[in-house]
Amino acid sequence: STPKPSSAASDVYKRQMINNFNINQVGEYKREGIVHRLDRVTSGIMICPIDSEAFHQLQKDFKSRKIKKKYKAITEGTLKSKTGEINLPLIHSQNNRRKREISKNGREAITKYNTISKTNSFSLLDIDLITGRNHQIRAHFEYLKAPIVNDVLYGAKKVNDLDENTICLQSYDIEFKLFDKDYKFSIDEPDYFSLIMNM
């Protein structure tokens, strides 16, 4: 696994990883790569297997929701409930094709959250991503009127101390089983999370 910085597109980051990887370490070159995506503005862990069998197995496991993905996020304001489950289907927005929006005719999208801490202005959340739709977390919390901090596309205010391509959303923990072996990868929160929560 490898941490992707926010502002790096998954495809671009994949090419960079391949260019930086010494294939002599593993012998014959094989076409593998990233088995899942993160939004361009989201930071965090990405799985990049170099073995063909592992690559295809992990692809299947992502589709069948066997891989546990956890995120941390900071939202504007506070939520009505400290913990909750958001079960709201998503479609492409009719007004902005870059966005997703809630629709009863959309694809199933389930997000669970728990509030870790909060201030008068912000909430730090631990999020379980049950389904993995594009922009799922961002659209769900916009709907709850608690957008991800600095996520201007989804209704948040611009934070002067953050780059426009950085939002307060991080994939920080992934767990999965592969060929009867358990794997768990975790990373620390980025420094700007503390900056926001101390504002």
Where are these regions (language model features)?
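RNA pseudouridine synthases
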Residues: 6-199
